[in-house]
Amino acid sequence: MPSFDIVSEVDKQEIRNAVDQLNKEVSTRFDFKGSDARAEQTDYELYLYADDEFKLGQVMDILMTKFTKREIDVRCLEKGQTEKISGNKVKQKVTVKTGVESDLAKKIIKLVKDSKLKVQASIQGEVVRVTGAKRDILQEAIQLVKGSITELPLQFRNFRD
């Protein structure tokens, strides 16, 4: 039976490249001269540091620009609370969401079942597997999910006949 997987993945190396480009741009920009603005990465978590809220907003804008240039969808970014650290300096945690969370997976399964397409969808960890009798029906399911789910960038992988 033909099947495919619905996943949400972000390449860790592309994140690293975007963060490196951000740090390089911040170090050379005139409006950040003498500033301690920077970004650090640990796996899928980013920490943005700046001297004040305004500069933190600018660092976030630069981050989104760099992600877009590296073809990373910015919908996968989840901003955390802004924290004050020593003096006037501020820090913000930004999480890169990967994997299809259970709430979104249930929403996808409900969407597919309510569409009356002859396919079955099941949750397998952070992946939603969709199986059907014909390839054409699976392609209709892909179009349905692409058109309806917009809160997280989804990829359709492992298409098998």
UniProtKB/Swiss-Prot annotation:
Pfam families: DUF520. It comes from the Bacteria. The keyword Cytoplasm does not apply. One of its GO terms (cellular component) is cytosol. Keywords: Nucleotide-binding. One of its GO terms (molecular function) is nucleotide binding. Gene3D superfamilies: 3.30.70.860, YajQ-like, domain 2. NCBIfam families: PRK05412.1 (NF003819). Belongs to the YajQ family. HAMAP family: YajQ. Nucleotide-binding protein. This is Nucleotide-binding protein NE2248. It comes from Nitrosomonas europaea (strain ATCC 19718 / CIP 103999 / KCTC 2705 / NBRC 14298). The lineage of its organism: Bacteria, Pseudomonadati, Pseudomonadota, Betaproteobacteria, Nitrosomonadales.
